[in-house]
Amino acid sequence: MQVPKNNIYTVSRLNGEVRQILEGQLGKVWLNGEISNFSAPSSGHWYLTLKDHYSQIRCAMFKGRNQSVSFKPVNGQQVLVKGAISVYEPRGDYQLLIESMLPAGDGLLAQQFEALKMKLAAQGLFAADTKRQLPKNIQRIGVITSPTGAAIRDVLHVLARRDPSIEVIIYPTQVQGESADLNICQAINIANQRLEVDVLLLTRGGGSLEDLWCFNSEALAHTIYNSALPVVSAVGHEVDTTISDYVADVRAPTPSAGAELLSQDSDNKSQRLATVLSRLKQSANHYQLKQERRLSLLEHRLQRLDPKRTLQQFEQRFDEMQLRLEAALSNKLHGLSRRQQQLANRLEKQSPKHKLALETNRLNYLATRLQDAMQDTLNQSEQRIKYAAHQLETVSPLATLSRGYSITTDANNQIIDNAAQLSVGDKINTRLRHGQVQSTVTQITDES
């Protein structure tokens, strides 16, 4: 082999020319890769390796450049960098001198998420005093989701189990992909135009940050904020958080949790019915005690007044009270019957017939007991009135006359109970059971 005399490179010369060629030919490039071997010595410079599945390249980012990076790089993080290819001549290593660095993939989305979150918070869209209270008695729920996704199946399953009387109206929409956020906005606007539901449930199942990205839309945030209907956001899993969660009136961690939040257990409804019946019974007992006190007062007044007139007034008042009691009982029973029929109609759609039959029998049983108790009270009151009237008739002067006695008075209408009160020739008047007799005293006999 013949060695050339004039074209022999030194190592330094070769590395220098390679550097000039690389820097001159490639210029600035954008590179996407995963960080490894990251180090940040006291000098403030950053040194790292960017790699993919098949290759890797050494990188350096000097202090003057890395101070503008808004995050701290870590090993395993995907980044997007811009830089120039160069050669580190002392080792003959070629490397990328990074000028700027951005998160790639989820990292970039996370950065955009935080920026939008800060912007909307500054505009007041997350303020607690703007949140609306959910209705207490929800009858109809509007679900904004994909009609074929797992979320709607979970929601319907929970509602059927907890409260089958709740009606569900689905507003179908995309929940992933390009323009999905605008599709969701349209569904919310349609629901607000129709105003056919009590509350909106915005929901979908779990997914990656990219899958859920349509729920981080600024347009969707303003649509939720301006909704006249209360909005519950139940997007993804418990660890997922979206902009819609912050803007919504209430956030639920999962679709199933959202359905549970908006429904009441059927057992709770039965308890409420039992509470209504208990209050009705207490009201009836209170009314009964009140009427008994009135009866007692009337009996006391009856003893001081004319018996017949007082008795007539009392009988009239008794009739009025009886009519009022019967009307009140009828109204209460009618109201309970109407409420029972409403519940029966709503529950009939889901066929909870057995439970409804039990509740109906229980209601009829309580109503019968209440009616019997009120009738017993009326009968007792009537007996007390009759007894009081009999007592008054017993001590009445007219009753004494009916037994054959008479009452004798002088000319001044003073009752004569002693012969010493009279003189021969005095005029006297004798009152019998039927009629009066006027007499003149002709003889006085002292039987003492």
UniProtKB/Swiss-Prot annotation:
Pfam families: Exonuc_VII_L, tRNA_anti_2. It catalyses: Exonucleolytic cleavage in either 5'- to 3'- or 3'- to 5'-direction to yield nucleoside 5'-phosphates. It comes from the Bacteria. Its EC number is 3.1.11.6. The gene is xseA. This is Exodeoxyribonuclease 7 large subunit. One of its GO terms (molecular function) is exodeoxyribonuclease VII activity. Keywords: Cytoplasm, Exonuclease, Hydrolase, Nuclease. Belongs to the XseA family. GO terms for cellular component: cytoplasm; exodeoxyribonuclease VII complex. InterPro entries: Exonuc_VII_L, Exonuc_VII_lsu_C, OB-fold_nuc-bd_dom. One of its GO terms (biological process) is DNA catabolic process. Bidirectionally degrades single-stranded DNA into large acid-insoluble oligonucleotides, which are then degraded further into small acid-soluble oligonucleotides. The keyword Disulfide bond does not apply. It comes from Shewanella sp. (strain MR-7). Its main location: cytoplasm.
